[in-house]
């Protein structure tokens, strides 16, 4: 099991937070899985992504309580041709003065740990999900663009699952359960 106990808002992220106090909204632009590793004391100084592997998919953001933003991130191995180990997760944000910055970074507890991502041919359909919580005075001011191509509605899922159950309900299978 991987432990992600090294998680910080970077120095540039803290500077952006002070701008949020002036009325700007936090605009999270993307999230990236990386295989790099730094001494935990250096995480707050991160300005670049180390050994980027792939962009993560945003799941719908929610606000479980006032001032708290829940940000789920999702990864699939659909296009992975060389397996790797996720040791760092970067959340990027738009700074009104500097453009895109490393806002937040989380790192596995040790360099030999991480989430293993196999290739699509090794394990088709593999996925992983991480959820991060950010607490602010105005968490409802966080803007994240969620790509609707990566989500399904409850109705769509129920229809799909129902069709799959019908597809596997053949007379041969039914006769096994009747015996």
Where are these regions (language model features)?
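A signal for long, low-complexity, Ser/Thr/Asn-enriched, surface-exposed stalk/shaft
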Residues: 152-179
């Amino acid at each position: 099991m991987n432990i992600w106990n090294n998680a910080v808002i970077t120095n540039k992220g803290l500077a952006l937070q002070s701008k949020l106090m002036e009325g700007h909204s936090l605009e999270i632009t993307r999230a990236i899985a990386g295989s790099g590793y730094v001494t935990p004391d250096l995480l707050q100084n991160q300005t670049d992504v180390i050994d980027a592997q792939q962009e993560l998919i945003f799941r719908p953001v929610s606000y479980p309580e006032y001032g708290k933003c829940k940000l789920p991130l999702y990864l699939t191995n659909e296009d992975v041709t060389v397996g790797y180990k996720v040791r760092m997760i970067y959340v990027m944000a738009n700074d009104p003065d500097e453009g895109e910055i490393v806002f937040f970074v989380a790192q596995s507890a040790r360099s030999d740990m991480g989430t293993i991502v196999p290739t699509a041919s090794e394990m088709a359909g593999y996925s992983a999900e991480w959820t991060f919580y950010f607490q602010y005075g105005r968490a409802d001011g966080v803007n994240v663009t969620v790509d609707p191509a990566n989500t399904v509605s409850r109705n769509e899922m129920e229809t799909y699952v129902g069709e799959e159950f019908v597809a596997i309900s053949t007379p041969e299978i039914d006769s096994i359960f009747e015996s």
